[in-house]
């Protein structure tokens, strides 16, 4: 490093000869006053050249402040014109190429002309001479005293000013020099400091400095008040802490306890009595220890207290004792629900195994069936029969995974998931836990709740279920989980695989009648404040309500209509009518209005091209009519009725089969030439799809092509292949119930579905004739009036263009009844 020797500082009264032209050094973020000594770091090439020029002459250099601090290449317009002539007292070249100079301000100057710009700025200056101040001026003397006193006061308030400066200030007698010295030491903004430098009159400049000192005094006063308030608050908190500690010590000496200590001791006892697993108990005591060390008002203290409350309230070791009396359990199940034998048998099997083997995992069941068949209420009965607590949570519309697993404790307002909340609500670790509407779970950017349920419903994993909030394992293996769904198709495969699925079919008319007599009518009479003295509802009236006012697989609408009848009777009783009201089929319309549904399928006669099919929907079975007609055309096939792709393909397959067997049906191979076929399924606003309408489509086409009428009392279901084989279908019981509601006498089913008849109650089978079909000819033999069909008058062509006559007494399906119908 190269160093230039020191130059002695000039005294204030020392004569100075300043040349007119000097090298210019632009400075940033500082204003240099006369007689001010400060170091400057010089790094720009143009500035280093200016320093070199000054050192090569008389060490004098002109310092002007830049208007913009970030300007790396300042122009003449970017610098203030009023600056300070300075002497370079010392120069040191640094290893990084920069130069450090120590300068002393000498006199103010005004730039009148920029002479050169390279290799360094050179300027012509005019020295600024300040006017003299009379020594006898009392006003000036008073101002100087006021300024000195103000400076002393702000230093006492904490303003950083060196003691040497204070000594110099006290001995100064010149107002201009006093103003410059104070301005250079109180940390003014660059704009304010430059404005002071440009004031030539010393007294005016000192007055401006006094204004800045007053402003600084006010700011420091406010700062002191803020700091005092903060210290006072901190001191108050510390004082409270010491007093609280002293109070605790005094209470301990007296054998007393403060409320917080008593609360923490109760929490400690609760943890000891909660029968937690060792790992959980260790964590609980650890968090309790943290809570004891915290100030009660600390933000984390509230969160820890809530966490520990959850820990002690969870039923870690609390369980209800199972009632293993199988006969009593059977009695309770029969009291609450009529029929549903399959589910009752499964519950009794569980109790029997539990009786023989004490330790076993809780079953995970899934009840699938239409709305209103008793899935949810069955869970309550199971809990009552087993002597367990019952918890139900609805999963319909749940889209956030945190609803199942909970939120992590770091979030404000975090809580455990609904599984842990349900167990706390139950107060035991082995309740009957119902997950209602499992098929209506959603998923979005917050996660997939169905995936979170995988751990809950897996017997191999749920003994170590970890909720995000608790973050400790909880044993769910003793819980008996029961899920409910309207359709199993929408439940994800991995979740479905973990459950034992039990199908609940819709109720028959006889079952509905029995349930209404045993449960619905007594319940509605009680809810509406009437008794058997005021109302009697006959069995036939109930049958009328079932047939003409409700069309459902379950019982909700039936109970609603019975409730409507009871309310109308209750009103009359309340008005003073003392009669005993007897509800008969003839008087039902008086209370419920005109019949909403007319039995389907009641046609006057057998018709050509109209076939009764059977469909399955999530709300039960439905009757599905298929119509086919032939007309002159170009051999086209038209399909209407909002049919799905599978159903359209069934029509194509049926037509291909008929064409392959045209000779047997007395049809020419080109029987489609010159004719169009139109297949329609009524209720066109409702989407329909599924493979099991194949035999229905084939029968309608054969009837339309051969002009052989279809029997009106025959319904059918089954899938067809190109070889004419009839394949099995699902939902047989629901379809048979729909056929019975429609007055059908004969039902044609696939031969491979004969095994399913064992699960259908005998009283249902007695109402219809069931015919099994292996091939489509078996179906046609039952459905058509004559089979094989006779040869038509015009051999080889369709028998005639048949337009199906209108059916009488057929009500349009209610809105939504066939939504998503699967044939």
Curated annotation (Swiss-Prot):
Domain Lon N-terminal: start-end pairs: 22-217
Conditions for induction: By heat shock.
Domain Lon proteolytic: 605-786
InterPro entries documented for this protein: AAA+_ATPase, ATPase_AAA_core, Lon_bac, Lon_bac/euk-typ, Lon_lid, Lon_proteolytic, Lon_Prtase, Lon_prtase_N
Catalysis performed (reactions): Hydrolysis of proteins in presence of ATP
Keywords: ATP-binding, Cytoplasm, Hydrolase, Nucleotide-binding, Protease, Serine protease, Stress response
Main localization (coarse): cytoplasm
Residues at the active site: 692, 735
Residues holding ATP: 369-376
Location of region: Disordered: 788-823
Annotated EC: 3.4.21.53
Subcellular location: Cytoplasm
Pfam families cross-referenced by the UniProt entry: AAA (PF00004), Lon_C (PF05362), Lon_lid (PF22667), LON_substr_bdg (PF02190)
Gene Ontology CC entries for this record: cytoplasm
Biological process, per Gene Ontology: cellular response to heat; protein quality control for misfolded or incompletely synthesized proteins
Any one GO MF annotation of this record: ATP hydrolysis activity
CDD domains per UniProt: RecA-like_Lon (cd19500)
Family per record: Belongs to the peptidase S16 family.
Function: ATP-dependent serine protease that mediates the selective degradation of mutant and abnormal proteins as well as certain short-lived regulatory proteins. Required for cellular homeostasis and for survival from DNA damage and developmental changes induced by stress. Degrades polypeptides processively to yield small peptide fragments that are 5 to 10 amino acids long. Binds to DNA in a double-stranded, site-specific manner.
Quaternary structure and interacting proteins, as annotated: Homohexamer. Organized in a ring with a central cavity.
Protein name listed in UniProt: Lon protease
Species of the source: Geobacter metallireducens (strain ATCC 53774 / DSM 7210 / GS-15)
Protein's gene: lon
């Amino acid at each position: 490093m190269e160093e230039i020797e020191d130059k002695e500082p000039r005294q204030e009264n020392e004569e100075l000869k300043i040349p007119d032209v000097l090298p210019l050094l632009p400075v940033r973020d500082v204003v240099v006053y006369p007689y001010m000594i400060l170091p400057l770091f010089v790094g720009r090439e143009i500035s280093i050249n200016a320093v070199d020029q000054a050192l090569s002459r008389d060490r004098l250099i002109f310092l002007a402040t830049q208007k913009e601090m970030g300007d790396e290449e300042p122009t003449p317009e970017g610098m203030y014109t009023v600056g300070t002539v300075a002497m370079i007292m010392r120069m040191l070249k640094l290893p990084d190429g920069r130069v450090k100079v120590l300068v002393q301000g000498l006199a103010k100057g005004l730039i009148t002309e920029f002479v050169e710009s390279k290799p360094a700025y050179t300027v012509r200056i005019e020295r600024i001479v300040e006017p003299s101040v009379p020594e006898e001026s009392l006003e000036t003397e008073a101002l100087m005293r006021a300024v000195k006193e103000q400076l002393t006061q702000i230093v006492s308030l904490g303003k950083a000013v060196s003691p040497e400066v204070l000594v110099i200030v006290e001995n100064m007698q010149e107002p201009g020099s006093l103003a410059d010295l104070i301005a250079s030491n109180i940390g003014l903004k660059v704009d304010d400091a430059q404005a002071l430098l440009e004031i030539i009159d010393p007294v005016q400049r000192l007055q401006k400095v006094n204004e800045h000192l007053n402003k600084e005094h006010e700011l420091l006063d406010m700062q002191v008040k803020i700091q005092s308030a903060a210290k006072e608050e901190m001191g108050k908190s510390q004082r409270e802490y010491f007093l609280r500690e002293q109070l605790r010590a005094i209470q301990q000496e007296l054998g007393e306890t403060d409320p917080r200590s008593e609360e923490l001791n109760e929490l400690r006892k609760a943890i000891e009595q909660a029968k937690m697993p060792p790992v959980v108990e260790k964590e609980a005591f650890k968090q309790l220890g943290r809570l004891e060390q915290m100030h009660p008002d600390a933000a984390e203290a509230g969160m820890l207290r809530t966490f520990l409350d959850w820990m002690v309230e969870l039923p870690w070791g609390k369980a209800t004792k199972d009632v293993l009396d199988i006969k009593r359990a059977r009695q309770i199940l029969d009291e609450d629900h009529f029929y549903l034998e399959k589910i009752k048998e499964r519950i009794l099997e569980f109790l029997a195994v539990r009786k023989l083997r004490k330790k076993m995992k809780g079953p995970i069941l899934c009840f699938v069936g239409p709305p209103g068949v008793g899935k949810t209420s069955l869970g309550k009965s199971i809990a009552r029969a087993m002597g367990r607590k019952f918890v139900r949570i609805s999963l319909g519309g749940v889209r956030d995974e945190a609803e199942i697993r909970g939120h992590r404790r770091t979030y404000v307002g975090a809580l455990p998931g609904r599984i842990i909340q349900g167990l706390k609500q139950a107060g035991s670790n082995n309740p009957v836990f119902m997950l209602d509407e499992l098929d209506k779970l959603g998923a979005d950017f917050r996660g997939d709740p169905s995936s979170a349920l995988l751990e809950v419903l897996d017997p191999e994993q749920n003994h170590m279920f970890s909720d995000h909030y608790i973050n400790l394992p909880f044993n769910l293996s003793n819980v008996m989980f029961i899920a409910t769904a309207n359709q199993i198709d929408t439940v994800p495969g991995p979740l479905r695989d973990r459950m034992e699925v039990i199908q609940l079919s819709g109720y028959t008319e006889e079952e509905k009648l029995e349930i209404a007599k045993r449960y619905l009518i007594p319940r509605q009479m009680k809810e509406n404040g009437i008794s058997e003295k005021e109302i009697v509802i006959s069995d036939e009236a109930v049958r009328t309500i079932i047939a003409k006012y409700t069309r459902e697989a379950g019982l909700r609408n039936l109970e609603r209509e019975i409730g409507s009848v009871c309310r109308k009777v209750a009103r009359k009783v309340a008005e003073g009518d003392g009669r005993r009201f007897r509800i008969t089929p003839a008087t039902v319309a008086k209370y419920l209005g005109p019949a909403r549904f007319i039995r389907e399928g009641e046609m006057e006669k057998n018709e050509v091209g109209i076939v009764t099919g059977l469909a399955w929907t999530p709300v039960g079975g439905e009757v599905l009519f298929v119509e086919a007609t032939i007309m002159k055309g170009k051999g086209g096939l038209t399909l209407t009725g909002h049919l799905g792709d599978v159903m359209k393909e069934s029509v194509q397959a049926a037509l291909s089969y008929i064409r392959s067997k045209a000779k047997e049906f007395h049809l020419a191979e080109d029987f489609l030439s010159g004719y169009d076929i139109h297949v329609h399924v009524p209720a066109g606003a409702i989407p329909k799809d599924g493979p099991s309408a194949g035999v229905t489509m084939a029968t309608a086409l054969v009837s339309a092509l051969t002009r052989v009428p279809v029997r009106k009392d025959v319904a059918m279901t089954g899938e067809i292949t190109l070889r004419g084989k009839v394949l099995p279908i699902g939902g047989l019981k629901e379809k048979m119930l729909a056929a019975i509601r429609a007055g059908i006498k004969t039902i044609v089913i696939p031969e491979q579905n004969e095994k399913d008849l064992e699960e259908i109650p005998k009283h249902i089978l007695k109402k219809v004739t069931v015919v099994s079909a292996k091939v489509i000819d078996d179906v046609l033999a039952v459905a058509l009036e004559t089979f094989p069909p006779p040869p038509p008058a015009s051999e080889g062509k369709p028998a005639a263009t048949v337009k199906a006559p209108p059916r009488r007494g057929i009500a349009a399906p209610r809105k939504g009844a066939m939504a998503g119908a699967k044939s």
